[in-house]
Amino acid sequence: MLEKTFTEKTFTLEILYHVGTYENSIHFIFDHASKTCAIVDPAWNADLFIQKITDKGYTLTDIWITHWHNDHINAVDEIAEKTGAKITVGVNETRYLRLRHAVTTVDDNDTVTLGDTKATIINTPGHTAGGICYLLDGHLIAGDSLFVYGAGHCAMPGADASVLFHSMQKFKQIADEILLHCGHDYGSQITTTMADQKSGNPFLMIDNEDDFVRYRNHIHDGSRTYPMQPVSQQALDALL
């Protein structure tokens, strides 16, 4: 596993990459003042995550979920059972979520708080019916809604490429300097600024909804390889 750390005024963001069968990225937010931690989309190895947090002298109090897919939540119940952590999920995602523990729901523009650290909720459905992102100081944790030079598929229950198109319009409004952190390391870089995504991610470069849906559902998978590289407008227009 690869690990990266980003330190801000009120929190430290640590990310474990290439975790488990689908090589997920697991995000830890450590609030400096309260010595509490939130973990985002914990899957595959509950004990490893709990031990990591404990070894740093922090208490795990929160589990933040971006979307319901099993590769992002299969350690949630075990962690909640062992720590009593509160589970947060988007209000429109609960009908797909299969967890034993109760959840707290959030909606667009809500704020979740961890000690002195605050994250703004951005509803970004499309990959799932109720997917959300967490916008912190300088960082966007996007789950699988947006990847480095890519975006989530629309192939499972609740997914809709037309809805995803409108979520992309929200991503375009996020400040250029914000760093993007994704649920999987599929891109040519682990993270980039949103400015880089706006100029090189095809899903943020298509302005017409019909073209976007056609590209997402019928063109993208056959025209790109991993790790995903930035795309020029000229190359994208040729595909459309």
What are these language model-derived features?
Residues T21-E23, S34-C37, W44-T120, S199-D210, ...:
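Active-site HxH/HxHxD metal-binding segment of metal-dependent hydrolases
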Residues I29, D41, H67, I79, ...:
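Divalent metal-coordination and catalytic microenvironments
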Residues F11, N92, D110, T117, ...:
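Well-ordered beta-strand scaffold positions
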Residues M1-T5, H166-L240:
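Accessory terminal helices/loops
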Residues I87-V91, A142-G143, C182:
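Hydrophobic residues in well-ordered beta-strands that form the structural core
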Residues H27-F28, N109-L135, Q173:
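Core dinuclear metal-dependent hydrolase active-site scaffold
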Residues L2-K56, C133-G143, Y149:
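Conserved beta-strand hairpin/beta-sheet module of binuclear metal-dependent hydrolase folds
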Residues I63-I73, N123-A129, L180-G187:
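Histidine-centered catalytic micro-motifs
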